Amino acid sequence: MNRLTKFSASAGAVTRREFAHRAGLGIAGFALARRGHPAQEAPHSQLALARNPERRLAIGAALNLLGRIDFGGRDLYLKANFNSPDPFPATTHPDTLSAVVGFLRERNCGRITLVERSGMGSTLDIWDKLGVPGLAQQLDLNLVALDDLPAEQWRKEDLPGSNWKAGIEVPKFLDRDTYLVQICNLKTHRFGGVFSASLKNSIGLVAKFGRLNAGYNYMRELHSSSQQGAMIAEVNLAYEPKLIIMDAMQVFASGGPEAGELAMPEVVLASADRVAIDAAGVALLRLQREGPEQQLNRRAVYEQDQLKRAAELDLGAKSADEMRFLTADARGAMLASQLEGIIQELPKPKK
């Protein structure tokens, strides 16, 4: 399911299935086994996982695990997470933005345009409070606050058969051929959707107030609906990101999206499959906080509304069997094995 130009697996990557064998080989055997290639399998969504307390090293390791990526000089849109004026993990960490931009430039991209529609205030105001304009100037990024786009730069996405009453409006530049890279955080979400990762980050590409359907409040429709999780997934039919980087160095294990209980997995995930990366993210959140009081623990991973609907819409991997974890070391492989187990398991029965 690779969707990147010249995107190939790294020969040194370790899959979860390989790890199960290698764990019994000892240090020497593990080093030797890493030189081999995995047996031929059915197509999988590649999901790179890196663990490192140093953010830049974790980002670099995860992205390098995905192998050779060449954007062919194409201009890119970059969707990070600037939903509120609160610091990471509520919003994108400035070091993450800087590291990802550096990686994209090393992989032969053209101009990079950072786009956003913040949910908890004016995008420009939130950017100012977070110091985004200054950082964008240092990184030579174009900035586009979607709140300020005129009507002629929006288009209607009808989404037939969805839970949206009259579809949605998205910027004209956004379609399934757009070269868009996404940086998402990982957190629980107490206002709806239960969790926020890649699928939910796409809501920041949808108009709050209609330009073509003048004055219509799309976000009121979303947040008042009992089908909010499904609607979040349905928005993702409007486009297909070429690459997603999930910064889970810190997460909100409860609360969210702007504040909550902090946990520190020190993990970065990268993939071209937003469903696979969100499934792994949900599993990672469940590791941070066990027990039925954690809403994510009450359903199996793929029974979460966002992921269930995303799988129905064929937006990405539909089970752990369609994912292939790539890791660089035994520590990462052990975590990947844990995550895969959580993704596969059924929820515990209520007592």
Regions found by a protein language model. Give the residues of each.
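N-terminal and secondary-structure boundary signal
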Residues: N2-K351
